[in-house]
């Protein structure tokens, strides 16, 4: 795991990255330095490993946040929710996705969508709907961090040829991200983190 810290006001945003499973899915444990609770983003595999890391950090899980519903991002959700009693947030548009893409593992307790702001684990989380990879993909903004799921990667973007994907929607979502004025450090669903400024400059899908 890597543990970057970001200053937000007089507090620190802590981001712990676990890369899980055969597809190398990035799962993020995110918490405020003053809080003993955390949010877990996209626990796709090995829930026992995620829970072990949370426990080692002395935290409890307040919520699971899903950027989208593909099986490699949701496979550990049900077990973590059962163990902790936490809520699980998902964009309602993901419910239209063909079930074979979720491997029957889609589980949630609450929905969120465009323009929603959540206050969880001492964090303020803004939701941007970014369809394309899936019908209900979202990016999550926490301070100057963007959790982009499979919408934006370092040097690339998510596939749109899966059932429920849309190239037209993806192009519109990427244009929207390219239009954001603030610079964010981008934490994607796969691969290394990057910055939005770097992607605007070098990523052909954002130009």
Spans of model-derived segments:
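Metallo-beta-lactamase
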Residues: 97, 103-104, 124-129, 134-207
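Active-site neighborhood of phospho(di)ester-bond hydrolases with catalytic His/Asp-centered motifs
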Residues: 40-41, 62-69, 88-92, 129-132, ...
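Active-site HxH/HxHxD metal-binding segment of metal-dependent hydrolases
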Residues: 38, 45-124, 201-205
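Conserved beta-strand hairpin/beta-sheet module of binuclear metal-dependent hydrolase folds
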Residues: 12-57, 139-149
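Core dinuclear metal-dependent hydrolase active-site scaffold
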Residues: 15-18, 28-29, 115-141
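Short, Lys/Arg-enriched N-terminal segments with co-localized hydrophobic residues
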Residues: 1-11
